[in-house]
Curated annotation (Swiss-Prot):
Pfam families, sorted: ATP-synt_DE, ATP-synt_DE_N
Keyword Ion transport annotated: yes
Lineage: Bacteria, Bacillati, Bacillota, Bacilli, Lactobacillales
Membrane topology: Peripheral membrane protein
Source domain of life: Bacteria
UniProt-listed InterPro entries: ATP_F1_dsu/esu_C_sf, ATP_synth_F1_dsu/esu, ATP_synth_F1_dsu/esu_N, ATP_synth_F1_esu_C, ATPsynth_dsu/esu_N
Name of the protein this chain belongs to: ATP synthase epsilon chain
Compartments (UniProt record): Cell membrane
Subunit note: F-type ATPases have 2 components, CF(1) - the catalytic core - and CF(0) - the membrane proton channel. CF(1) has five subunits: alpha(3), beta(3), gamma(1), delta(1), epsilon(1). CF(0) has three main subunits: a, b and c.
GO terms for cellular component: plasma membrane; proton-transporting ATP synthase complex
Source organism per UniProt: Enterococcus hirae (strain ATCC 9790 / DSM 20160 / JCM 8729 / LMG 6399 / NBRC 3181 / NCIMB 6459 / NCDO 1258 / NCTC 12367 / WDCM 00089 / R)
Annotated function: Produces ATP from ADP in the presence of a proton gradient across the membrane.
Signal peptide: none
């Protein structure tokens, strides 16, 4: 393949992902976007969701990455994702994600009972992150 994308995902903890890809699909605040080689330069905010990367080294291999917010910049066939946190499907500890989901559900119930809107928002984000990690882990 003459044209490909270089994809890297970086978090405050360091580099999470670095490969060549034929296409990258991510969810932005405006909806899903697919990035192919020669895409116009763009910077978009990402939501808590999965990023799909179809690699160039296999016609069928897709890498799945749980991304918890951040931004994606596309320029000169380089897709750079700077995320609050991110995990590849193979690195997700499902039991830990399940515990985080249960903890967030408890916190949501407690926040509703106390009518604590700030805690409700925090717990809701934690729940979305846990659900996203669980969803992405099922692709491995």
């Amino acid at each position: 393949m003459d044209q490909y994308l270089t994809v890297n995902v970086v978090t405050p903890d360091g580099l999470v992902y670095d490969h060549h890809a034929a296409i990258v699909v991510a969810r932005t605040t405006a909806g899903e976007i697919g990035i192919l080689p020669k895409h116009a330069p763009i910077i978009v905010p990402l939501t808590i969701d999965e990023v799909r990367v179809k690699r160039t080294d296999s016609d069928t291999h897709v890498d799945w990455i749980a991304v918890n917010g951040g931004i994606m910049e596309v320029r000169d066939n380089v897709v750079s994702i700077v995320a609050d946190s991110a995990e590849r499907e193979r690195d997700i500890d499902v039991s830990r994600a399940e515990r985080a989901k249960q903890r967030a559900e408890r916190q949501i119930a407690e926040a509703k009972e106390k009518e604590d809107t700030n805690e409700l928002k925090r717990a809701t984000v934690a729940l979305h992150r846990a659900i996203n990690r669980i969803k992405v882990s099922k692709h491995s």
